[in-house]
Amino acid sequence: MIIRKGPAEIDRIGRAGGLVAETIAHVGGRIEPGVTTLELDTVADEFIRSRGGVPTSQGYKGYPRAICISVDDVVVHGIPDEAVVEGGSLVTIDVGVTLDGAIADSAYTFAVGTIDAESQRLLDVCQDALAAGIAEARLGNRIGDISHAVQVVVEGAGFSVVKSLMGHGVGRHYHEDPHVPNFGEAGRGPRLSEGMTIAIEPMITMGRPEVWLAEDGWTIATSDGSLAAHFEHTVAILPGGPRILTPRVGVPDLSRTGTP
């Protein structure tokens, strides 16, 4: 069942989203060669709690850490540990925050130091795809319009969409209806209506789209070892257009659409 929210609830989700954005920027500022992903997770946990929030991922279906940190060929759900971040890596910070009963979710892939041109293009295309998806998140459109817009940008650039992973409703719960795939036909799927809040999140690879699940039951990586990127915003569907509830702070963003 799709849960539609009123203005006050959307504002609460937006406040949670503001803390999500601040957390991503705060953790991003600590990413450097030599730091461990567990150290970054601790930074995130302490930052969120110091501002009255709770890391939504921690304990969710047994997940053991505060946030997800996915490096290089890991697409999503990387569990922070003692692994050391290296220069030239791609590091995705995926943060969910619960604040005053509202939940927001966002992700951002950082480059660690200097990366090659093709890796940078992967990041740029993923952000472009997110922007294209958000632009279609308007009253009267359908989920398929978002999905198709993302797919066109990604595949048009020669990259692959991970079809087994997708966005979702969010707000009262971490994962709500509807599913928001990153591929599909325009004009198909549930119609977008006022008060829907959804996480739009292209997850793309430089190589093939297939992925595999690690023995830890969480980490999902590319089957061919190719690099992956993941950008995500929580978005509200409103009469004036899509409202990004997790607007970026302190990091470059190509996906500003609608009301910040």
Please report, for each region that a protein language model flagged, where it lies by residue.
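Active-site neighborhoods and metal-handling regions in enzymes and metal-associated proteins
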Residues: 1-260
